[in-house]
Amino acid sequence: MPEAPGPAPAALPARGTLLAFDFGLARIGVAVGELETRRASALLTLHGEASAPRFAAIAKLLDEWRPVGLVVGMPSHLDGTPHEMTARCRRFANQLHGRFGLPVLECDERLSSAAADAALAEAGTHDWRARKQVLDAVAAQIILQHFLDTHGHAKP
């Protein structure tokens, strides 16, 4: 069965905030970035599997940060074929668009968690418990930085 397409891509303004999500069944990593500066930062990790509290927390983040768009990491295998989580991530992207009405853009997230783990180890976070607490937010940062580096506007 073919996958349902994600939300239609939308043009983004030259300035404004983006929030990015590294969607997982137990955790969602969140990062924030600015279109003008083209820089992303890890923000936080949402914990729990229940949909209502997740979307309530996301609504609070949207109210606080007032983003002009959202980016959702889309997993795939190294050869580009869909990952078992691809359809769930696309559904999450569609739910974000439907609930909040903001442009939602998809971004390849291949190896983002591995890159996040390596970056945390290099930064001196060797305790696996401490790394696990921030891993998803750093993965979201990597996804958003990749998006900012490869999409849209010229760097200042």
UniProtKB/Swiss-Prot annotation:
Residues in coiled coil: none
Alphabetical UniProt keywords: Cytoplasm, Hydrolase, Nuclease, Ribosome biogenesis
EC numbers, comma separated: 3.1.-.-
GO CC field: cytosol
SUPFAM superfamilies the UniProt entry points to: Ribonuclease H-like (SSF53098)
GO biological process: rRNA 5'-end processing
A molecular function GO annotation: nuclease activity
Subcellular location: Cytoplasm
Pfam families cross-referenced by the UniProt entry: RuvX
PANTHER family on file: POLYNUCLEOTIDYL TRANSFERASE, RIBONUCLEASE H-LIKE SUPERFAMILY PROTEIN
Function summary: Could be a nuclease involved in processing of the 5'-end of pre-16S rRNA.
HAMAP family according to UniProt: Nuclease_YqgF
Family: Belongs to the YqgF nuclease family.
Protein name from the UniProt record: Putative pre-16S rRNA nuclease
